C-alpha cells in the first residue's frame, strides 16, 4: 500500500486553513480593483530562458526546471513579476499603457523550508506597466497600506528605499561594476549583522574593507525620515545618480503621507537592497511590528529594464507582492484566524424523513436570501447531528421536527451559547426566519 504523504515544503490545505486563505485573497482582489488593477493569469510553466534571463544566481539555484516531453528546457515560475514582463512584452500592443494588473497564483522555489516559508506558495501581486511617473510609485505604497489595513492589521511598517542611492554611492566608490554582488551581500545585513556582511562584501564582491565600510555607513543611516533624507547627499558624496534617487525617494515619501499613509507606518530604510537583480529604483518591504522575525510580508519595487529582455519597447514597471502564506502564518501565530471550517454559518439537521422536502425548501429560501446553509444528508439522531455542527464551526442550527412543522415555527439555536428561540416559519412566510438568522450571524 502506498503511504499517503506530501513532499517536504509542500502542504495540503484543510477547510479550516483554506477558508481564511480565500477570504484574504478576496480582500486583496477588492483592494486591487479599488485602485483600478485588472486580473490576469499566466502559465505555470515558462521557457527556461524566460525565467533565468534576469534573476540571480540564488534564484536560478532555486528554480524547479526540467525538460518537457518535447525536449524543451522549461521551468516553474518562481515569482509573478518575470512572467509579467514576458506577458507585457507579448501583449502590450493590445493592452495599451499604463497597464495595471493584479495576479494571485502559486509560485515554486526550491528553498529550505522554515516557519512561514514553503516551496510552493501563493503570491498576490499588483503592478503598473508603462510609466515612470512618481505617482505610480506613490500609489504602490498606498496599495500596500490599504491592503494590510483591509486585512485587519494595524501595526505594520512599510520601509522604502531607492536603489539609485546605493548605485550612486557605488559609482562614487569606483564599484559600479560590482553593484550586483555588493547589493546582494547588503540584502543580508538584517539577517547576519554588520561584521559578516562586511566580510562577505570583501570576499564575494572583491571590495576593500574601507569600501565595504562606506556602503554600510550609508545602510546604517538612522533617524526620522526627514533627517535621513537631509543627510544622504553628504553621505553619497554629491553623486548625480544618488542625488536623483534621493529626490525621487523624497517625492514618494511625502506623496504617500499626503495620500493618507500614516507616518507611523512609513519608514525610510536605506539598508534595503532586495535580492533580485531587476530592481532599478524605489524598493520597499513591509514587516509586522508584532512579528518582525517572520520577515517581509509585502515587498517589491521599480524595475524599469526588466521587459527589455523580451522587447525593444521601453516598458518600465512598479509593483509589489503580498506573501499570502507568510502572512497567514503570521496571523495564525498572533491568534487572529478563526477556527471556522465551513463556508456557511447555518446548519439544518435532518431527522424527520417525512419532512425531507420541507428541509430542502427551507434551505433554498435561506440561500435565495444570501444565507449559506448546509443540510445534514442522513436522518441520524438530533444529538449526533448537533455534535457534528459544533465540531464544524457552524454558528446557528435550525431545528424542525414534526411538531415544529405542524406548529408553523422552527427553533433557532445559537451553537456557541446553546441559546434557542422559537421563530415563526412557513414556506409562504419565511421573512421572520431570515431576519432571525441574519441577526444571529451578524
Curated annotation (Swiss-Prot):
Presence of the UniProt keyword ATP-binding in the record: yes
Superkingdom classification of source: Bacteria
Gene Ontology MF terms in the entry: ATP binding; histidine-tRNA ligase activity
Gene3D superfamilies per record: Anticodon-binding domain, Bira Bifunctional Protein, Domain 2
Pfam families with a match to the protein in the record: HGTP_anticodon, tRNA-synt_His
Enzyme class at the top of the EC tree: ligase
Chief location category: cytoplasm
A GO biological-process term: histidyl-tRNA aminoacylation
Annotated InterPro entries: aa-tRNA-synth_II (IPR006195), aa-tRNA-synth_II/BPL/LPL (IPR045864), Anticodon-bd (IPR004154), Anticodon-bd_dom_sf (IPR036621), His-tRNA-ligase (IPR015807), HisRS-like_core (IPR041715), HisRS/HisZ (IPR004516), HisRS_anticodon (IPR033656)
The entry's keywords: Aminoacyl-tRNA synthetase, ATP-binding, Cytoplasm, Ligase, Nucleotide-binding, Protein biosynthesis
GO cellular component, one term: cytoplasm
Family as reported in the entry's similarity comment: Belongs to the class-II aminoacyl-tRNA synthetase family.
UniProt name for this protein: Histidine--tRNA ligase
Amino acid at each position: 500500500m502506498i503511504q499517503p504523504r506530501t513532499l517536504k515544503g509542500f502542504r495540503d490545505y484543510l477547510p479550516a486553513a483554506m477558508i481564511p486563505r480565500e477570504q484574504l485573497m478576496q480582500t486583496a482582489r477588492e483592494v486591487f480593483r479599488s485602485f483600478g488593477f485588472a486580473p490576469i493569469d499566466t502559465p505555470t510553466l515558462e521557457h527556461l530562458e524566460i525565467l533565468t534571463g534576469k534573476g540571480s544566481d540564488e534564484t536560478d539555484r532555486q528554480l524547479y526546471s526540467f525538460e518537457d516531453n518535447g525536449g524543451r528546457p522549461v521551468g516553474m515560475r518562481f515569482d509573478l513579476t518575470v512572467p509579467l514582463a514576458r506577458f507585457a512584452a507579448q501583449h502590450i500592443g493590445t493592452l495599451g499603457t499604463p497597464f495595471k494588473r493584479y495576479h494571485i497564483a502559486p509560485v515554486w522555489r526550491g528553498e529550505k523550508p522554515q516557519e512561514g516559508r514553503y516551496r510552493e506558495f501563493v503570491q498576490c501581486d499588483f503592478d503598473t506597466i508603462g510609466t515612470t511617473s512618481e505617482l505610480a510609485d506613490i500609489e504602490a505604497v498606498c496599495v500596500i497600506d490599504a491592503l494590510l489595513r483591509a486585512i485587519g492589521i494595524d501595526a505594520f511598517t512599510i520601509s522604502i528605499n531607492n536603489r539609485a542611492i546605493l548605485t550612486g554611492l557605488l559609482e562614487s566608490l569606483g564599484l559600479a561594476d560590482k553593484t550586483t554582488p555588493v547589493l546582494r551581500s547588503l540584502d543580508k545585513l538584517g539577517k547576519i549583522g554588520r561584521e559578516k556582511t562586511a566580510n562577505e562584501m570583501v570576499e564575494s564582491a572583491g571590495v576593500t574593507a574601507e569600501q565595504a565600510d562606506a556602503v554600510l555607513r550609508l545602510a546604517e543611516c538612522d533617524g526620522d525620515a526627514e533627517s535621513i533624507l537631509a543627510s544622504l547627499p553628504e553621505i553619497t558624496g554629491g553623486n548625480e545618480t544618488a542625488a536623483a534617487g534621493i529626490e525621487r525617494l523624497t517625492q514618494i515619501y511625502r506623496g504617500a503621507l499626503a495620500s493618507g499613509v500614516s507616518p507611523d507606518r512609513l519608514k525610510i530604510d536605506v539598508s534595503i537592497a532586495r535580492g533580485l537583480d531587476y530592481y532599478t529604483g524605489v524598493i520597499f518591504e513591509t514587516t509586522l511590528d508584532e512579528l518582525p522575525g517572520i520577515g517581509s510580508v509585502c515587498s517589491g519595487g521599480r524595475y524599469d529594464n526588466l521587459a527589455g529582455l523580451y522587447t525593444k519597447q521601453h516598458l518600465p514597471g512598479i509593483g509589489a507582492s503580498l506573501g499570502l502564506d507568510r502572512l497567514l502564518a503570521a496571523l495564525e501565530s498572533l491568534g487572529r484566524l478563526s477556527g471556522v471550517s465551513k463556508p456557511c454559518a447555518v446548519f439544518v439537521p435532518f431527522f424527520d424523513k417525512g419532512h425531507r422536502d420541507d428541509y430542502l425548501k427551507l434551505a433554498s429560501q435561506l440561500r435565495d436570501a444570501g444565507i449559506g446553509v448546509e443540510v445534514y444528508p442522513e436522518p441520524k439522531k438530533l444529538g449526533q447531528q448537533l455534535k457534528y455542527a459544533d465540531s464544524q464551526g457552524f454558528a446557528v442550527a435550525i431545528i424542525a421536527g414534526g411538531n415544529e412543522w405542524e406548529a408553523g415555527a422552527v427553533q433557532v439555536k445559537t451553537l456557541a451559547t446553546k441559546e434557542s428561540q422559537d421563530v415563526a416559519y412557513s414556506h409562504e412566510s419565511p421573512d421572520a426566519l431570515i431576519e432571525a438568522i441574519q441577526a444571529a450571524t451578524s
